[in-house]
Amino acid sequence: MIFAKNYDNNPKVLKEFDNVVVLKSNYPCEYPESSKIPIYIYNANSNKTLLFIHGLGTRNLKYLKWFPESFARNGYNSALMILPYHFDRTPKGHKSGELFLSTTDNYILRSRFEHSVVDILTTLNYLKERFKGDLYLMGFSFGGMVSTIATSLRNDIKGLSLAVTGGNFYHITWKSFVTGVLRVQYEENKECNPEKCLLYHKNEYPEYLKNLNKPDIELDKAPIACFEYDPMTFAKFIKTPTIMFRALFDIFIPKNSTMDLYNIINAKKELYSIPTGHLSSFLLRKYILRKTLTFLKE
């Protein structure tokens, strides 16, 4: 089994209304709510199309639409894809996004990352069929992680923008505020601890990365399963020009996480630091938009 590549990513339209298209998810899922992919479309009648991927558990859908709406005003057909287990795709009895933080089981987490990536690939194919022309991708926070993976698996993404995101699950699991709930679970089930995780990432992860020569990641072959869905594992294969934004006071994505991801990307790239926290980075959305637009034109 190869991560994300064992699943079809041909789009099948289930419903269209107003500016929303609903696709069938090609990833098998136990929750019917996440078996459909809602996509908000903003048509600029352009030969350039950008897909925007939101972050984890975001509460307000309205402000997420600001980026695709703004790209549309600047000449890009744009789309906002709702991630699995979020908003209308949230299973009954759960909160938006919490299924990414509700378990320490690496195999379940891997499947949820994989589900997200397969849905992105399916959506990109839909946008390519509908609008033709060039494709671009932007991911915010968790959306940046799965956008990184998706970009490594395609050769037709012309530009990638990553905001307040990162890789290396040692930093994300043990140094991030948002994953505190996972650390509590680890303390209880003894599956992992900071010392054990650090040894894996210091000793075995570099060797694992060195031995990879393409982004076809075989499942159940890594020393630990989290290597198989870490954005860093895929980032070394990105050839797409990439712009990144790091929040200086980010307690969700540690600095080392962002820098590790940035440093391993082997393409034309730029990194900008913004004087905000993670959530407050939205206050500088116009700066992020302006820098991204300039970068994508180059």
Where are these regions (language model features)?
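Short beta-strand element of the alpha/beta-hydrolase
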Residues: 38-39, 47-55
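Conserved alpha/beta-hydrolase "acid-adjacent" motif
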Residues: 251-257
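N-terminal cap/lid segment of alpha/beta-hydrolase-fold proteins
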Residues: 5-45
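Hydrolase active-site cap/lid region
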Residues: 149-215, 273
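Catalytic histidine neighborhood in serine/cysteine hydrolases
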Residues: 263-279
